[in-house]
Amino acid sequence: MTKPIIRDPIYRRRRFDAEIIELCVRWYITYRLSYRDLAAMMVERGIVVSHTTILRWVNRYVPEFEKRWNRYARPVNTSWRVDETYIKIQGKWNFLYRAVNKYGKTVDFLLRPDRGIAAAQAFFRKALATSLPRWPRKITLDGHKQSHLALRLLRREDPRWKFVQVRSSQYLNNLIEQDHRAIKRRCASMCGFKSFRSAAVTLSGIELSHRIRKGQFSFGRGRYGNSGSLKQLWERALA
């Protein structure tokens, strides 16, 4: 008797195979392709899928894929470089807060509609939650006053922030400004974001792909470890 194929529950009631869904999502967040490009590429493989279906796959599965990859995330260094970059949504500028360590590895990111004190505080809290139990030793900022004030206010909430050295250096922050370029290049090939939620999900996928390229995940020292093609690494992460 043939054994039934065990299907990942996240693909339950989906008409397309999991392999097709994963391929489209992976290619979209990794390469400079539009949804229509991917739909045309699938047709060449004999698979008819609309570009709107691929869009729904990205919005549905990127958060789950990110969660599964994060099980294998390497810890990052405790010296942060923090900066914001502009992202256009519905014709208006929004702000993507990002932090990398001194080696250029991504610490965390957060999309916000504004650039105020509350936005900066929200980012620092999120980045800290990602890094715990390790606290940052140093945080390097640009000259944006709200970010400095946000850290001063956080010190009043939690005295442990007082042990974090805060620096302001445009030279040291060149590292993260260079790192922004990979994200901006991918966004430039899109026709703009139509909603804040869609932008947040898509950007988290782009950031995930960027972290994979930077070698920020480890699958241990087993038979295969971190070797293999990008496809094989994805298969291990999603298993």
Which positions does each model-derived feature cover?
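Helix-centered, glycine/charged polyanion-binding patches within enzymatic domains
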Residues: 143-207, 211
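Basic, short loop/linker segments at the boundary and entry of helix-turn-helix/winged-helix-like folds
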Residues: 1-31, 46-50, 55-56, 75-81, ...
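DNA-recognition alpha helix
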Residues: 34-47
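Short conserved beta-strand segments at catalytic cores or DNA/RNA-binding microdomains
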Residues: 32, 90, 94-106, 116, ...
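Mobile genetic element proteins and their domesticated derivatives, centered on retroelements
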Residues: 24, 38, 54, 83, ...
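Short, basic alpha-helical nucleic acid-contact segments in DNA-binding proteins
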Residues: 48, 56-78, 147, 156-158
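C-terminal domain-tail junction helix/linker
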Residues: 189, 198-208, 213-239
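Active-site beta-loop-alpha junctions of metal-dependent nucleic acid enzymes
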Residues: 15, 60, 109-132
